[in-house]
């Protein structure tokens, strides 16, 4: 697990954050929460309402929700583990905003997701479009309520 690692996660409900914090603890990595400038309310997250904020964002490929803070020294990280819930079969638009905000050249990006119903789906490949430069991508994993053994096994594969 050589090189400095960052675990960056977006979590609307707290599930992905808990998994990300556990990954960071086990990997000895730094943790960064991707927090939207405007926090999502329960109404915003109502996927059954086509007019909810999350529905509108996910139906607009150009939507990029603002992020409230930045990673202070992204250049110091060699590996970035990015966690997110699956929305509409892919990563939420805020993950695209995060990936477009930094130069990941020469870094390894390792995505993971949480999902109540669907798996990684096409989210893994879709993220590649948002990153410029020479980046090594590791295959994404779905980690729903993993125990320490599962996380360690996954980290051994990707770090």
Predicted regions and their residues:
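Structured beta->alpha junctions
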Residues: 11-12, 87, 116, 143
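Conserved strand-to-loop "acid loop" that flanks and positions the catalytic carboxylate
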Residues: 84-85, 113
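N-terminal beta1-alpha1-beta2 submodule of the flavodoxin-like/Rossmannoid cofactor-binding fold
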Residues: 1-82, 89-91, 96, 100, ...
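Short, glycine-/small-residue-rich phosphate/pyrophosphate-handling segment
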Residues: 110-147
